[in-house]
């Protein structure tokens, strides 16, 4: 059996995993696989168990199921997983279905028994750490969840916030341009309301700070993804981040860097929604704008406090799958390459590697097990090889993760980017020509390589030689991305030559 070079490389990297840590600096070098616990893997290992996303019911995914499929995740080169919230949820089947996703909590001191036991969650953490991998857990501090109208909430069901005194007075957000409304009024609607905790009160702050520190300690958690960050006043977050004692990345669902970037002053990182929108628009069709993406890369790295601590993504459980816009596999490969080789921490959403195409919630919350977990699909292999070269570059260049990605050129269909210290840089060339794109040679200047230097294109494992003028002749075809790395630096890596 022929074994792909990237699997050999990743295996070698895994067994040499460093000691675990959980600081922002340590998270820079991670690569995250995000999954909905209920939708990734079942304890019984079934790949046929029914999961109709339209029903919005529990489908049976568990923490033990994740443990059993860590080879599948690690085989793509991921070094961390992010799982959905673990707290006990509202028990009813609402008109919007079950709280299978984890964002309608009622008891923060109990676990969601649908996913397993406390021992199962601890076992997941241990299983990851034995592999040198990190555990990131999703948390919600903004709200609880209630099956019913906001005007008739029975606050006694919430633990420990069991009276109305802990909450903002009921009002739904009507105007998202009004930050006071965004923070003080409620999400949800009169079918499922999301009672909004008054996080300005010391009793609420202190409860959350104590809770989050205990959660991290009890389950040996390495990082937190924080939901609905913009709906809580900013001065709440530094204390929460400090109490957690690990890297925290917040969801600020807004594409304006002037709005989103300042939240990085109150927590370690945020999801890179400013990049998400131009990234999606650049590659969801063959007529997308490279200008907007080029400009936003530069804006984010100049305006955000630290673009190397942001989370880069194009899919999640709140936004439509990339393949719901286009089934062009070449475009999907380009967008995945960008995610992994841009600044910050790459985040791939479970099912993206199988080209899942669900649209808006709930269609984008498909069961990964229904794919059968193939490891030979085109995107699985591409993601694995991109993670492999990123992981290798990090191991060889201490400055790789803090070097800010530099888009060195653009035209209507192409954007090359450079990341890494001189002599060890990765140059990624992205195209939105699509799978029917023509074959041509791109003469690339500004890559920073030296005349006569040999480079390996690590997707196709071919080589090119830098011209006497310093330009790199890059063969382009079929709209596929290209990733260049100095050939001499690959010695002993198993990458392309294993």
Swiss-Prot record:
Catalytic reactions on record: Endohydrolysis of (1->4)-alpha-D-glucosidic linkages in polysaccharides containing three or more (1->4)-alpha-linked D-glucose units
Tell me which residues bind Ca(2+) 2: 227, 251
User: Do you know which Pfam families this protein is assigned to?
Assistant: A_amylase_dom_C, Alpha-amylase
Q: Where is the secretion signal located? A: 1-21
> Is Disulfide bond among the key words of this record?
yes
Alphabetized CDD domains for the sequence: AmyAc_euk_AmyA (cd11319)
Site described as Transition state stabilizer, located at 318
Active site positions, chain numbering: 227, 251
| EC class | hydrolase
Sites where a glycan is attached: 218
Per the annotation, how and in what number is the cofactor bound? Answer: Binds 2 calcium ions per subunit. Calcium is inhibitory at high concentrations.
Give the GO biological process terms.
carbohydrate catabolic process
EC number of this enzyme: 3.2.1.1
A molecular function GO annotation: calcium ion binding
Q: Which UniProt keywords are listed? A: Calcium, Carbohydrate metabolism, Disulfide bond, Glycoprotein, Glycosidase, Hydrolase, Metal-binding, Signal
Q: List the disulfide bonds.
A: 51-59, 171-185, 261-304, 461-496
Chain positions recorded as Ca(2+) 1 binding sites? 142, 183, 196, 231
Q: Does the keyword Hydrolase apply?
A: yes
Binding site residues for substrate:
56, 104, 143, 225, 230-231, 255, 318, 365
**UniProt cofactor(s):** Ca(2+)
Indicate the family of this protein: Belongs to the glycosyl hydrolase 13 family.
> What is the name of the protein in this document?
Alpha-amylase A
Q: Where is the organism placed in the taxonomic lineage, from the top?
A: Eukaryota, Fungi, Dikarya, Ascomycota, Pezizomycotina
């Amino acid at each position: 059996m022929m074994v792909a070079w990237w699997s050999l490389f990743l295996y070698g990297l895994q067994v040499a995993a460093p000691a675990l840590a959980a600081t922002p600096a340590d998270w820079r070098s991670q690569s995250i696989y995000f999954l909905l616990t209920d939708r990734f893997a079942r304890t019984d290992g079934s790949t046929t168990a029914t999961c109709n996303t339209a029903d919005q019911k529990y489908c049976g995914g568990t923490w033990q199921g994740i443990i059993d499929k860590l080879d599948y995740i690690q085989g793509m080169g991921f070094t961390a997983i992010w799982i959905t919230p673990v707290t006990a949820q509202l028990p009813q089947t609402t008109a919007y279905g079950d709280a299978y996703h984890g964002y309608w909590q009622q008891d923060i001191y109990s676990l969601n028994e649908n996913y397993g036991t406390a021992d199962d969650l601890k076992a997941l953490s241990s299983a990851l750490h034995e592999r040198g991998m990190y555990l990131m857990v999703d948390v919600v501090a903004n709200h609880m969840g209630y099956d019913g109208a906001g005007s008739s909430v029975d606050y006694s069901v919430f633990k420990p916030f069991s009276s109305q005194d802990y909450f903002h007075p009921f009002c739904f957000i009507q105007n998202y341009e009004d930050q006071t409304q965004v923070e003080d009024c409620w999400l949800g609607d009169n079918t499922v309301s999301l009672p909004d905790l008054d996080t300005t009160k010391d009793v609420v702050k202190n409860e959350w700070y104590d809770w989050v520190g205990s959660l991290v300690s009890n389950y040996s958690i390495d990082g937190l993804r924080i939901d609905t960050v913009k709906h809580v006043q900013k001065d709440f977050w530094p204390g929460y981040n400090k109490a957690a004692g690990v890297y925290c990345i917040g969801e600020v669902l807004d594409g304006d860097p002037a709005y989103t970037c300042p939240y990085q002053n109150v927590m370690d990182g945020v999801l890179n929604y400013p990049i998400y929108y131009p990234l999606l628009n650049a590659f969801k069709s063959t007529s997308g704008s490279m200008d907007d993406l080029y400009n936003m890369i530069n804006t984010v790295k100049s305006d955000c406090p630290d673009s190397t601590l942001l989370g880069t993504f194009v899919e999640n459980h709140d936004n439509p799958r990339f393949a719901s816009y286009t089934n062009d596999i070449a475009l999907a490969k380009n967008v995945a390459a960008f995610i992994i080789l841009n600044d910050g921490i790459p985040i791939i959403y479970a099912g993206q590697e199988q080209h899942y195409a669900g649209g808006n919630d709930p269609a984008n919350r498909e069961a990964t097990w229904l794919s059968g977990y193939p490891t030979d699909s085109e995107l699985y292999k591409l993601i694995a090889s991109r993670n492999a070269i990123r992981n290798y570059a990090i191991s060889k260049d201490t400055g790789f993760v803090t070097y800010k990605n530099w888009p060195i050129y653009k035209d209507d269909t192409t954007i090359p980017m450079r990341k890494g210290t001189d002599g060890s840089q990765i140059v990624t060339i992205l195209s939105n020509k699509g799978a029917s794109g023509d074959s041509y040679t791109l003469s690339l200047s500004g890559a920073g390589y030296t005349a006569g230097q040999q480079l390996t294109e690590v997707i196709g494992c071919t080589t090119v030689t830098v011209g006497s003028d310093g330009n790199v002749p890059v063969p382009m075809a079929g709209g596929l991305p290209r990733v260049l790395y100095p050939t001499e630096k690959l010695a002993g890596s198993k990458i392309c030559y294993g």
